[in-house]
Amino acid sequence: MEYGSIVTSVADIWKEASTESERYSQIIYGESVKILGKEGNFIHVESKDGVKGYVKKRLIGDYSEKRYKIIRRFKAKNLILPFGSYVNDEDISDMKIPEVYIKNINEKYDPVILAKKFIGVPYLWGGTSDFGFDCSGLTQRMIRFGMNYEIPRNSGQQRDASIEVKDLEHAKRGDLIFFEGHVGFYLGNNEMLHANGSFSRITINNLKDNSEYSNMLLSIMQKIGRYKY
């Protein structure tokens, strides 16, 4: 099986071999993809979380096994590496990335603390980077980077794969709260951090402040889920 690696800051995964189709998801610098085929200027790929779609051919290069993680957005002369990008020894040498930006791939971080760094970042359908997140892209990226643990890509899959928590009173910081087509991190004290499509950015909202928005969320809440990292 042939593999490739993303060689640009962020690559969109499209439903079809056209940028006019739906953006399914995104993959960022250094992430690997399985090559399924080729169609014109696009490569048919499968990401490591099982998303299949099309990526522009010029955005995929050779795959390298030895990697590190970018812990802050790195601005080079011609390329900005998003938080969570994977780099190898050759990248570090060629790009002259300062060591303060990189960490060993196995080091762990609290996903909630990480997520708070991105409050105010724009909401982007299909987004998985600090250029823009959707709800499940945010939860997946923070858990993947922070705990080196894989959860599914979309909110419905994340919901189904999680361990159910009885109610908000039993929820713990870092649990995921699932709604119809939506997910966010539970922070405690009835607060949730999420990539908020209604506000077009990442926000913290109180679920029990009796506002119209919080009442709407509670009316469509489906499950509180937990992952054992």
Regions found by a protein language model. Name each.
Residues 17-22, 72-77, 159-168:
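Short alpha-helix capping/helix-loop boundary micro-motifs
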Residues 21, 50-53, 61, 95-97, ...:
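Short, surface-exposed beta-strand-loop junctions and turns on beta-sheet-rich folds
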Residues 122-130:
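Second-shell loop/turn segments in exported
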Residues 31, 85, 174-175:
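Structural motif
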Residues 115, 129-146:
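Active-site nucleophilic cysteine motif
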Residues 149-210:
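...with weaker cross-activation on analogous glycine-rich loops/strands in unrelated enzymes
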Residues 215-229:
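Low-complexity, Gly/Ser/Thr/Pro-rich intrinsically disordered linker/tail segments
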Residues 1-17, 26-28, 36-39, 46-49, ...:
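SH3-family beta-barrel domains
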